[in-house]
A protein has these predicted regions:
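Acidic, Ser/Thr/Gly/Pro-rich intrinsically disordered interaction regions
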Residues: 1-39, 88-227
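Short, contiguous, well-structured surface segments enriched in hydrophobic/aromatic residues
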Residues: 19-83
Length: 227
């Protein structure tokens, strides 16, 4: 079962501080970014109510919502100068980086470049694969042997079938003389996509806690001593 993405009820007020924000960025813009993240969290959690009845368009929708969170969190951190962020450490940064690469690969192959995704070789998308369709498990799909199945997760692409896969990318190799000669299925899991989004939200919550503990006078004094 996929857990709902944590929301902003866990924020402690650090992101409400005006003084840490870059001088050339308004606090209103930061609030707009936070609002975008909040609405997207709600949208992703709403989809969970019928996650077992999703369609092809729902797959695209979920991938794009997670990508919106990724982009919005990036924009949020860009609201703060380097001297504010340099001492912030996110414990799950390594896992988040793996999740980011995974999400970018999924988004590229499904939404952005289904005919020529070539920048995600660790996930099998090296420019030789074409994404023909998004499919769900059926009796017809099970007819294909294990050699026709692969799956992807945070660690990359793997041979074989993963029972945790929720949907499949139906694709074939452009290197084949006969277009369907090298047809295969790549399994993907909703839980991995939701995990990426949740890691980003958790980073925001941790950053909020970091900002709450940050005192303006102490920060200015420390930076003056460094200079």
């Amino acid at each position: 079962m996929i857990s709902k993405i944590q929301n902003f009820k866990y924020l402690k007020g650090g992101l409400n501080k005006h003084w840490p924000i870059k001088k050339d960025i308004s606090y209103d813009f930061q609030c707009d970014v936070m609002q975008k993240i909040g609405y997207t969290i709600n949208d992703l959690n709403d989809v969970l109510e019928n996650i077992d009845k999703t369609s092809r368009k729902d797959v695209v929708y979920i991938v794009m919502l997670a990508s919106w969170i990724q982009e919005a969190v990036k924009s949020l951190f860009e609201c703060y100068p380097e001297e504010i962020c340099k001492n912030f450490v996110y414990a799950d940064e390594d896992l988040l980086n793996k999740g980011r690469k995974y999400l970018e690969a999924i988004r590229s192959f499904i939404c952005a470049h289904p005919l020529k995704a070539s920048r995600h070789t660790a996930y099998g998308f090296d420019g030789t694969e074409i994404c023909v369709d998004i499919r769900f498990e059926t009796k017809m799909l099970l007819v294909f042997g294990i050699d026709k199945h692969r799956y992807i997760d945070f660690e990359g692409i793997h041979n074989g079938k993963n029972d945790k896969s929720d949907f499949y990318l139906y694709c074939y190799s452009k290197e084949s003389k006969k277009k369907l000669e090298f047809a295969n299925y790549i399994g993907c899991s909703y839980s991995d996509i939701y995990k990426v989004a949740d890691l980003y939200i958790n980073k925001v919550i941790c950053f909020d806690n970091y900002l709450k503990k940050l005192k303006r006078k102490e920060f200015i004094k420390q930076n003056e001593q460094i200079r």
